[in-house]
Amino acid sequence: VHNYHLDWQNLLGVCHGGSQPNVEDAEERFSKRKIDRSCDVPKGGKPINERILNPLEIPADVRIYRYAAHTGRMIVDEDTCPPELVRKARNTIRELNLNAPRLMRMRREAIMVLEDEIENALAAGVEMEEFLTILAENFLLPDDNGNCQAFFSVIRWFLGPAAENVLSKYGYAI
């Protein structure tokens, strides 16, 4: 019997989707509510791999999703998502419950951090375009330990062209 939890090709198997109480920041990341479960939890053992995006095959140089800033809702960005991926991108949101209230709340919080950073910089007289590039570098590039910020796709969407310029500069090799 194949053990999918140990299979690198099954990257979704590593996310417990809010179902594990013994995680860092459990008060934020864990929920007893079934509606809050995402990723591997709703996927379970269902054979949906042909209907959803494979994380190993998503092109790095295009943005697939956009977000509603006031709700944190994830939406396929039909302006930037390649047409041949739109159906699978929608299925991915639905099948993995990527609009679980827990995830939407966490996305809103990430957006609010960026909004606060921008508001503070503007109040200090910093030039907006320059600051967006600084934010993109600080929030999208790995830190000294090689770790990236949570909600990379949200940050990428929010920072728009500044994010795309930084990612392009680094050859999307993040």
Question: Which residue stretches match the model-derived regions?
Answer:
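A broadly tuned preference for mixed-charge, low-complexity surface segments
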Residues: 24-47, 121-136
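Histidine-centered nuclease catalytic patch
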Residues: 1-35
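C-terminal, charged low-complexity interaction regions
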Residues: 80-174
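Conserved, surface-exposed functional patches that form binding/active-site neighborhoods
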Residues: 33-119
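Generic detection of intrinsically disordered/low-complexity segments and helix-coil linkers/edges
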Residues: 2, 59-61, 125, 151
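A generic structural signal for solvent-exposed, polar alpha-helical segments
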Residues: 14, 71-73, 163
